[in-house]
Amino acid sequence: MKKLVPALALLSLFYCKEKPQQEQKVPVQKVTAEAPQAEVIKDAVYTEFKPEIIRNVNIKGFDVGHAFSIEGYKIASGNYKPVDGNITLPDTEEDWGNRLLLLNDNNQITYQSKGFGEAYLYEPYFYKNRQNDNIIIVCQQAFEYFFGGEAFLFEKGKMKYLGNLDIEPNNMEIKLTDILKIKESKDGITFTFDSDSLVLQPGSKDRVIKNNNVKYVYDHQSLKLHQ
């Protein structure tokens, strides 16, 4: 009986030992990263500005009406001079008259628009998007009356023709570029007009309309009238 006492005591000590605490596992919450959203261009307003005017620009065979310096480039409007009253190259019977030229710092022509034909006025006006530094150029056209303007996009040293804004305010004292508002979004470039009434196809059909949110929209492919 005495031999059982030490054995019982050892057994008691064995069970009285503190049980090791099990590590508590905290459930890990899986966090799914959100897919990066595409950058959305908020409506950016193009504001008119006046670039540096260049005097005495010499372009062989070209009669310069207006010339400007922008970001190291020259932008000039005018027309190639006829020889003895005849159309000569680079003009052709289908491509002559007032046009826009882009020249690099070596005075080389890197872009020329298609000739618009005859006009007393073909004057560039400049509008800049401060978000991306793109520039819209609208060449105001006129005979004895104003008759719209051609729109171009100047982006990173490249020129692109957008289309013809065949519209004017219904007031012969002011012109297209006096009422023009330009805005850009991810959907394209919108041209609107600060005038109660407008004339479509001025100089030809002269169709007078109310300005019920009339606009031209360039949708990255073509320039279209919405009315």
Where are the model-predicted features located?
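Short, solvent-exposed loop/turn segments at conserved positions within beta-propeller repeat blades
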Residues: L89-G97, F143-F147, D206-N211
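Short glycine/acidic-enriched loop and turn motifs that connect beta-strands
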Residues: V83, Q141-Y145, S197-Q201
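Terminal domain-start segments
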Residues: Q22-Y120
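Acidic, small-residue rich beta-repeat scaffolds with periodic aromatic anchors
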Residues: K17-H66, F154-N164, N171-Q227
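Sec-dependent N-terminal signal peptides
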Residues: L4-L13
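Positively charged n-region of N-terminal signal peptides that target proteins for export
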Residues: M1-L4, E18
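Acidic/hydrophobic-patterned starts of short beta strands in beta-sheet-rich repeat architectures
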Residues: E71-S77, N129-Q140, K186-F193
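Short helix-loop boundary/capping segments
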Residues: Q131-N134, V138-K175
